[in-house]
């Protein structure tokens, strides 16, 4: 794929905080793999759409599956397609399997398509590609896999919050977003053939 090989991206996996979603007694790559496995049955419902969108945008389908797993647990934590309820706004901040940020003070995107549609997955992939490009421009000295990891972190919290490779997840959800997503993607690639 044109954005780097997900299998060559360094990862420390899920933080303790993220692993507590599933009440795991451990963190790291093992925890990310366990959570990806938990979501794998639901993920199969979306395999053909994921593969189609991956081919269309040059994104490894395993990475799309991993973002879906991390963001919405393959749809399991959504409420009529919505997630990340903001009590201050009295509204949800994110839409669909890939949790596209619709908060006007956040990503400000307009939700496209049904929450589990190929149109929605395409929107998520476009946002990811945009952020990978932003990170490539911001950090031209990083190798392709580092730029991919930075783009994944930026998908979660914007490229303005990525300041260094060593602390790429410093401002991400759980302090581990790109590391968790990469570990899940590696699992989906090797264990489920995405």
UniProtKB/Swiss-Prot annotation:
Annotated family: Belongs to the glycosyl hydrolase 23 family.
Family annotation (Gene3D superfamilies): 1.10.530.10
Protein name: Lysozyme g
EC number assigned by the record: 3.2.1.17
Record-annotated disulphide pairs: none
Task of the protein: Has lytic activity against M.lysodeikticus, V.alginolyticus from Epinephelus fario, V.vulnificus from culture water, A.hydrophila from soft-shell turtle, A.hydrophila from goldfish and V.parahaemolyticus, P.fluorescens and V.fluvialis from culture water.
Species whose genome carries this gene: Epinephelus coioides
One of the GO BP terms on file: defense response to Gram-positive bacterium
């Amino acid at each position: 794929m044109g954005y780097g090989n997900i299998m060559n991206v360094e990862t420390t996996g899920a933080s303790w905080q993220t692993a507590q979603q599933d009440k795991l007694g451990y963190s790291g790559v093992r925890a990310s793999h366990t959570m990806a496995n938990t979501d794998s049955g639901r993920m199969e419902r979306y395999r053909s759409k994921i593969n189609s969108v991956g081919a269309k945008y040059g994104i490894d389908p395993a990475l799309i599956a991993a973002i879906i797993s991390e963001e919405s647990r393959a749809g399991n934590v959504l409420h009529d397609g919505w997630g990340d309820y903001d009590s201050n706004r009295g509204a949800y901040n994110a839409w669909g399997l890939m949790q596209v940020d619709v908060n006007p003070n956040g990503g400000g995107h307009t939700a496209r398509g049904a929450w589990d549609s190929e149109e929605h997955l395409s929107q998520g992939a476009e946002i990811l590609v945009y952020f990978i490009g932003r990170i490539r421009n911001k950090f031209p000295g990083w190798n392709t896999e580092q730029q991919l990891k930075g783009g994944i972190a930026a998908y979660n919290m914007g490229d303005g919050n990525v300041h260094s490779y060593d602390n790429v997840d410093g401002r991400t959800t759980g302090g581990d977003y790109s590391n968790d997503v990469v570990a899940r993607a590696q699992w989906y690639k090797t264990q489920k053939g995405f």
